[in-house]
């Protein structure tokens, strides 16, 4: 609830800035093309997934937040142009958003700096990530861990630190042991950083003919989009009344919550028409009904299988 006039003005300004960026960056075009379409257009993009630079480990116990692992040593800055990395960063950010479980809207990020050298240092990609986190996916980051940073990173950090928004800076922790990743359970931490999880799904190749998102002018997509917009207008109308009431009208509170659920469900229904398949669908982590399920193989031979999550509700983990 944005209370002051200044906050409202900043909110409107930032939202307009975000919409402008999404249009100029063709975010929806990127997610519609997916790994297959982007790789077809740009051979350098095709090497990003197989390099296993970034992937999701699973969910945290508290608040069910996706845990994103980034192996910096797997990124060789000179092997792809800046434009390719911009597309890859946007595609990864949008893909990880599909793993978010309502009502949580945040993710945890672990930068594994072990093996880092200057050939891995990519100012463009680093600044793109920071710019996106601060400006275009606000309040998305719950915590960011910089794991086993070598001494040569100290100079880089001194240059980067002043550029960070204070809210982002306060969410960054440096650590050297897996048990210092305090909001990431040990059974989710990868064995390469001292955790218990082995055989993590890091990359699954797209298959020829794999589904891509529909073109903006496709009649089916336009029909689904119109249906979504109709519900969004209903949500906007009740939200206007809710704002006037300052959130004090119980009937409007309930009506707005109901419209919010309708809107979220409609977008989940619409999403397959907007997005190409991601590696998490190819791996079966996101199934055809958009249920979410990670399987955690442990180094002691156990397999932990969570009850499926949905975009609307989360459940607890159980062991086999």
Regions found by a protein language model. Give the residues of each.
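Single conserved hydrophobic/aromatic residue that forms the stacking wall/gate
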Residues: 2-8, 12, 311, 318-320
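Amphipathic alpha-helical protein-protein interaction segments
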Residues: 4-9, 78, 82, 119, ...
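Aromatic/basic-lined ligand-recognition segments
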Residues: 5-9, 13-110, 114-115
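Short amphipathic alpha-helices and their capping/turn residues within compact interaction modules
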Residues: 20, 24, 94, 98-101, ...
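Structured beta-strand/turn binding interfaces of compact recognition modules in eukaryotic regulators
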Residues: 70-73, 114, 147-150, 175-177
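Surface-exposed, flexible loop/turn segments at secondary-structure boundaries
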Residues: 75, 152, 180, 320
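Alpha-helical bundle/repeat cores within regulatory domains of eukaryotic proteins
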Residues: 107-159
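Contiguous terminal or domain-adjacent regions
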Residues: 154-313
């Amino acid at each position: 609830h944005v209370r002051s006039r200044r906050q409202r003005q900043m909110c409107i300004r930032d939202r307009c800035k975000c919409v402008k960026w999404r249009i100029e960056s063709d975010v929806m075009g990127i997610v519609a093309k997916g790994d297959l379409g982007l790789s077809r257009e740009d051979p350098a993009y095709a090497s990003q997934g197989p390099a296993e630079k970034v992937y999701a480990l699973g969910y945290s116990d508290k608040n069910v937040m996706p845990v994103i692992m980034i192996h910096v040593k797997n990124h060789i800055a000179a092997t792809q142009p800046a434009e390719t990395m911009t597309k890859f960063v946007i595609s990864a950010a949008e893909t990880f958003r599909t793993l978010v479980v309502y009502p949580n809207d945040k993710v945890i990020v672990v930068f594994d700096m072990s093996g880092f050298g200057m050939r891995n240092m990519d100012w463009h990609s680093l600044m793109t990530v920071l710019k996106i986190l601060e400006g275009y996916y606000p309040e998305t980051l719950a915590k960011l861990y910089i794991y086993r940073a070598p001494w040569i990173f100290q100079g880089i950090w001194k240059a980067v630190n002043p550029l960070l928004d204070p809210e982002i800076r306060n969410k960054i922790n440096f650590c050297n042991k897996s048990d210092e990743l305090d909001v990431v359970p040990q059974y989710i931490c990868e064995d390469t950083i001292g955790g218990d999880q082995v055989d993590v799904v890091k990359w699954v190749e797209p298959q020829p003919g794999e589904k891509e998102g529909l073109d903006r002018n496709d009649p089916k997509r336009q029909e689904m989009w119109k249906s979504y917009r109709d519900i969004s207008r209903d949500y906007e109308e009740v939200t206007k009344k809710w704002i006037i009431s300052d959130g004090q009208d119980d009937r409007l509170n309930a009506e707005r919550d109901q419209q919010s659920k309708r809107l979220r469900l409609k977008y989940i229904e619409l999403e397959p028409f907007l997005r190409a398949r991601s590696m998490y669908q190819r791996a079966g982590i996101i199934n055809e009904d958009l249920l979410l399920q990670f399987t955690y193989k442990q180094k002691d031979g156990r397999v932990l299988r969570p009850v499926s999550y949905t975009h609307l509700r989360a459940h607890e983990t159980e062991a086999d």
